[in-house]
Amino acid sequence: MDAFETDDLVAAQHRPGEHTYTDFLRRETLSLGMSVWPAGGEDTQRPHTEDEVYVVMAGRGRITVAGEDRSVGAGSVVYVATGVEHRFHSVEEDLQVLVLWAPPYRSRAGASASGEAAGR
């Protein structure tokens, strides 16, 4: 069985004031990661080559997806389709976000390592 505690995932990657991302599960059809954006931090990600589902576990901020903006906090779930512009912003409290990728992150040919690595 693969089982994880999000608190442990966050603690293992914690670097105060920095955005961090860790892949922790990868299968043929999907992958999971934990991303943390610090309060006041900047999200510099670019569109990805995979669909994403963000599940906000803790914190508060805002997200813009394809020009549509909304607030997010613990319990928010946001779907982002392949290739769509999206960005977290106005982070008031460190955002801890579970990220589901389908297919797995960077699994599609031609994925831009330089563009995607910055923001996941």
What are these regions (language model features)?
Residues 67-82:
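Short acidic-glycine-tyrosine-enriched beta hairpin
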Residues 82-107:
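Ligand-binding loop in jelly-roll beta-barrel domains
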